[in-house]
A protein has these predicted regions:
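Flexible glycine/proline-rich, aromatic-decorated loop/lid segments
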Residues: 5-7, 26, 74
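The feature captures the conserved acid-bearing segment of alpha/beta-hydrolase catalytic domains
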Residues: 19, 23-31, 96-105
């Protein structure tokens, strides 16, 4: 890694890049960026290159380009999370593969998390907070065949449970807790250093 030898210990909290899904390739991240740009353009009034920025008071494309990114995202009412990716420079391969081979920086590691790491709204992806909608969102991670047992284990039995602690626990485990555990476990197995 580029940072080899630059630090003596590491601390990680609230997730890692070793969750249920693989890290995006550069091509996939660029495609996602194009989709985001299209959503932004649609929200602020661009249609086939015309009416650019009209809905937000911009006179031309240059004025729109001059907006700070945060303001543009706010005006466009689009929420997005930056996507780390395998760019061939900083990240050359899947982190899980690096750790499986024991090629990570070998330093003591402290990992952790917080209560209520993630809201169920992240799993719902804009849909109403119902058991059925939460199940639909969770199926992408756990599959159709496991969903009823999963909801039984988490105690998600009614729509009320979706936004309360059972739903928070599920969302936190999907997005952060599992990936943090996996990072620590893989480092313990191949890093030759203690994990706390």
């Amino acid at each position: 890694p580029l940072c080899q030898g630059l630090f003596a210990q590491a601390m990680g909290s609230s997730g890692s890049v070793m969750g249920f899904k693989k890290v995006a390739t550069l091509k996939e991240a660029e495609e996602e960026g194009v989709q985001l740009a299209q959503k932004i353009a649609e929200k602020i009034g661009k249609k086939n290159g015309k009416k650019v920025g009209k809905k937000v008071g911009m006179k031309n494309l240059n004025e729109l380009r001059a907006l700070p990114a945060e303001e543009l995202m706010k005006l466009a009412e689009v929420r997005a999370v930056p996507v780390y990716n395998i760019d061939g420079y900083f990240m050359k391969e899947q982190p899980v593969e690096v750790f499986a081979k024991g090629e990570q920086t070998k330093v003591p590691l402290l990992i952790g998390g917080n209560n209520q790491e993630m809201t169920p709204l992240a799993v719902l992806m804009g849909k109403q907070p119902t058991v059925e909608n939460l199940k639909a969102g969770a199926k992408a991670t756990f599959g159709e065949e496991n969903i009823d047992e999963l909801f039984r284990l988490y105690g998600i039995n009614s729509d009320k449970d979706v936004l309360e602690q059972p739903g928070v626990n599920l969302a936190s485990d999907i997005f952060l807790d599992y990936s943090t555990w996996k990072w620590g476990n893989m480092h313990k197995l191949t890093g030759g250093q203690p994990v706390y």
